Amino acid sequence: EALAAFITRAAQAADLSPGMFKVVNMTCSTISKTTHLVIGRSAKKMDLTQNQAAADYMDQVRHPATDGDHWYVAFPVSEAHCAQCKDVIRLCQEGEEDKARRELAAYLLTLTDEAIDWYFQRPMALLGFGPVLRKVANVGVETTRKASRSLISNLIPKLGPEQLLASAQYQESMLLSFPPRTR
């Protein structure tokens, strides 16, 4: 679901060409296979304490929607980072596409690093993997990072003005505000 929200739906919102969409799907497939490999290897070996730590962490990143019908899995994004996303929209509307492309790429690269931290590195640190599982997990994280960075670096420069604006607007729509959680 996270891949669909962050990558696939973003690509659909930008109305990418079939060739560019194929690259997006290949990247998602690589990340998905890598993630399943890491989860498949580690889940079988987790003890009760590790399972409890994983469940507690998942509860921290789960936020109820205002309608109460569903939940979001989300991580905090700084105000400066939110402003950078909004600035991309402004640059697009002012016709400064080259600068908007650079800003969108920078925004997405930072967002990727944050997502990897929240969705991979923090949970792995909680689980206290041994050396073999830690190595498998680290390879998975770096594969995900490289695939994501490659997609951003290759895709953003090719976006036309309308695609660029649509992509920035989609990214902005992903920025949600949640009330503080209490247990």
Positions of PLM-derived features:
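Protein-protein interaction and targeting regions used for scaffolding, dimerization, and localization
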Residues: E1-R183
